[in-house]
Amino acid sequence: MNRKAILGAAVLPHPPLAVGKVAVDKKEIIKKTIASFQSLAKEIERLAPQTIVLISPHTNLYADYFHLGSYNEGEKIAWGDFSRFGDAESRVAVGFDEPFIDALAELCQKEDFPCGKLGKKTSFLDHGITVPLYFVQKQYSDFQLVQVGLSGLGLAEHYALGMKITEIAEKLGRKTYIIASGDLSHKLLADGPYGYAAEGPEYDERIMAVLERAAFGEMLDFDEAFLERAAECGHRAFCIMAGAFDGLKVDAKKLSYEGPFGVGYGAALFIPKEKDTARHFLEAFREKEAKKNEERRKNEDPYVQLARASIEHFVNFGKVLELDAKLKEKIVLEKEAYTKKAGCFVSLKKNGQLRGCIGTISPTQENIAEEIIANAISSASRDGRFEPVRVDELSSLVYSVDILSESEAIASEKELDVKRYGVIVSAGHKKGLLLPNLEGVDSIDMQVSIAKQKAGILPHEKVSLERFEVLRYE
């Protein structure tokens, strides 16, 4: 087994305007970024890898699965060009390292890790791949490619994939270089293509500081909601790259940073050094999360305890939790939980991201406690947006329970308040609901628009409106 299979790595952006005849008049503006691509190409030529693992946010992306690039049936070359960016002449072509890809997919299947070749096959390479390769192949072309996509899973899962990539490189004795392709924030300028958000420059400053210090453990601490507001592109790709160096000291070199068009372009190189037991960042992160979850459980509201117990019982045993005397002694609920009826929603989050949310506008069970049990099970097993919750996920879930008041009809949107009131929109037999005080929903227009979308109501359709209040338990 080759313990030095990973020769190095790079973080790079992927602006097509850096390539060939694309936007020739703008190349001087991003000359630092172009110089960084050229520096990378020379570094790769010096190291002479057999395989380049290239991680791209624009490769096929799935909510709960990492896709590894593979050819269309009958093809043996992967390729991409820049015709859609105005340059029909510049192109790249490369072969996939199929033994590496197959070995990685096999390892992931063996370890029940959601990564492999089950996604859509295509020999066409996205620009997250082709932009870096355009520069690399000008200097060095004696390599094969492993194309890695991102997923909707948490940052820790991305980091873990990087560790598995290193494991396969070492097992095969393959001299490997890793490129994490990704722009930084897309929200740097008010007059930029994506507008401005304060989180944009903040993200770029933070991530560049992390990269300069090779402080890879800090990558896992970025809040998911913050990342979304910053509109970053490459953070998950950077986490995969970071995982490839778990347990190793790393020399880092910042190449450049600029954002003249409202999108951050950061570039850095990394060289692995000796082992360092203090840099097992995934292990440390999971220990920290376990302590946080344990503390959270100690302070959970009884309604949340009931939702958690319902899901854990159902996932482990496939049975509905019974409200017997033993349970009532363990989870002490207010009297009204057994005497009153109300609609409720149970929401699940994992790694800061929604993992399930189902509820009832009006009560369907004998009491609030039974309503929570029923909706908790539905959230974990019947939310069509997600696969059913697995046993190994239970310890990572964060719960909230919303108990709804009776709704009241209102005449217009002026009577709404996104923090205080949830909204119900109706058009004919279509009805949609959105809870109040949701992260990222900061206007009445957005609240109503999302509720319409959930109901399958077109944006221009007239709707009747109802509002309601909730008591949220966490």
Regions found by a protein language model. Name each.
Residues 1-50, 61-163, 191-305, 392, ...:
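Flexible, D/E/H-enriched segments
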Residues 51-53, 177:
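Structural motif
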Residues 58-60, 184-185:
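Catalytic metal-binding/acid-base residues of hydrolase active sites
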Residues 65-68, 341-355:
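Polyanion/phosphate-binding surface patch
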Residues 149-203, 348-368:
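Active-site beta-strand/loop microenvironment that shapes enzyme catalytic pockets
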Residues 295-343:
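Short, basic/aromatic recognition patches
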Residues 361-388:
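A short mixed-secondary-structure module that forms the rim of ligand-binding clefts
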Residues 381-410:
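Catalytic phosphate-donor-binding core of small-molecule kinases
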